[in-house]
Amino acid sequence: MNCKINRNAAKVLKKMLSTEEAEGKMIRVYITHMHGDHAHYDMKLDTPAEYDEIVKTDKDIDILLDSREEFLDGVWIKYFYVPEEGFEITNLSKEPHGHHHH
């Protein structure tokens, strides 16, 4: 499976991973809900479970993805500082309409 993160996201995720509560845990991207042809995603700290694939990114951060969820394959984790701070997780390989902000 595939996952990409931009530089800002890597910085923020590294900070999250260096906290005490993150000890021994990894970043998981998961689907909050599906709408037919696209999904909404979120992230949390978690430990690998039976069906997970640990996906290496080019930013030295490993991301947990449930290998049974085809919509998780190819997710893009981005972090923006403007117009407001926050993560945007999209999957362009699965979304027919290009991307949209929520």
PLM region spans:
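Long, hydrophobic N-terminal alpha-helical segment
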Residues: 1-23
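Short, structured protein-protein interaction patches enriched in aromatics and acidic/basic residues
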Residues: 22-53, 57-64
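Histidine-centered metal-binding segments
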Residues: 35-36, 94-102
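A broad, low-specificity signal marking well-ordered, structured residues that form hydrophobic/aromatic
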Residues: 3, 27, 87
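C-terminal structural segments of small proteins and small subunits
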Residues: 71-98
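Generic, low-specificity signal for short hydrophobic/alpha-helical stretches with a mild N-terminal bias
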Residues: 9-13, 25-27, 59, 71
